[in-house]
């Protein structure tokens, strides 16, 4: 099991702590039906959709993540698949959730087009992603060692909000809600030593300049959460 899989949704993940309540608040207001958790990871949103009464399908490209999701939710239908080729028929779901995944996709259009394909007219797409401003002091994180033994990188594409609109609106999506939850202020004592980081992340600026990084990032948007609705006329 990879390190990201082990710690992805463990307590203390600030991004998830900030993102998850907003996503759940949006999901609380949607009609119950068939829901797709696209890039479901370990199934944190899958589980909540089940609690709300949805029939849920989970899709992820990572076997490690899916193993955790299946262990967590053995009665849910999970598929190993890429977001560009969802294993679902046209117009087969009422809601699509895609959480903290599109930052790893180089081109939004084909993925959002797949979401539009599987959504029924009038269906909802809920997307969360890392905010562009959150990347200023945080480059792409090193991940598990690659074939040569050196830490590999998981590519990240940080986008302005206009990029989501440029990709979504021509496909027939309408914006119902957009939220940019902010990082809570934090204070560090002058002599506070930063927590140790794994060796493959030891170069990150947040670790070496904690006070300056905290001052720059305090009260800045850390995530963006979109609620789009597919236009029934445009899609049908």
Residue ranges and their predicted role:
Residues 1-31, 44-48, 65-68, 72, 124-149, 155, ...:
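Conserved class I S-adenosyl-L-methionine
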Residues 34-85:
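Class I SAM-dependent methyltransferase SAM/SAH-binding core
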Residues 84-96:
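A short acidic, Gly/Pro-enriched loop at the edge of an enzyme's catalytic core
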Residues 95-108:
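A short SAM/SAH-binding and catalytic strip from SAM-dependent methyltransferases
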Residues 109-121:
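A short glycine-rich, Lys/Arg-flanked "PGG" loop and its adjoining helix->strand segment in the class I
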Residues 156-178:
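Short alpha-helix
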Residues 175-236:
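A C-terminal cap/extension of S-adenosyl-L-methionine-dependent methyltransferases
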């Amino acid at each position: 099991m990879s390190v990201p899989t082990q710690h992805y949704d463990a307590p203390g993940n600030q991004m998830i702590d900030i993102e998850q309540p907003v996503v759940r608040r949006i999901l609380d207001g949607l009609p119950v039906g068939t829901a797709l958790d696209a890039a479901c990871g370990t199934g944190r949103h899958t589980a909540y959709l089940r609690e709300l009464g949805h029939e849920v399908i989970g899709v992820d490209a990572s076997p490690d993540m899916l193993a955790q999701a299946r262990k967590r939710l053995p009665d849910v239908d999970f598929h190993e698949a890429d977001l560009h080729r969802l294993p679902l028929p046209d117009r087969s779901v009422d809601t699509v959730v895609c959480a903290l995944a599109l930052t790893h996709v180089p081109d939004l259009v084909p993925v959002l087009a797949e979401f539009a394909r599987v959504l029924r007219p009038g269906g909802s797409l809920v997307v969360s992603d890392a905010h562009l401003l959150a990347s200023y002091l945080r480059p792409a994180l090193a991940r598990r060692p690659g074939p040569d033994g050196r830490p590999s990188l998981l590519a990240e594409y940080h986008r302005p909000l206009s990029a989501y609109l440029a990709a979504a609106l021509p496909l027939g999506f309408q914006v119902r809600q957009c939220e940019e939850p902010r990082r809570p202020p934090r204070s560090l004592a002058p002599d506070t030593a930063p927590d140790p980081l794994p060796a493959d992340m030891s170069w990150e600026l947040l670790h070496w300049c904690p006070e300056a990084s905290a001052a720059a990032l305090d009260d800045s948007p850390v995530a963006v959460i979109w609620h789009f609705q597919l236009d029934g006329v445009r899609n049908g």
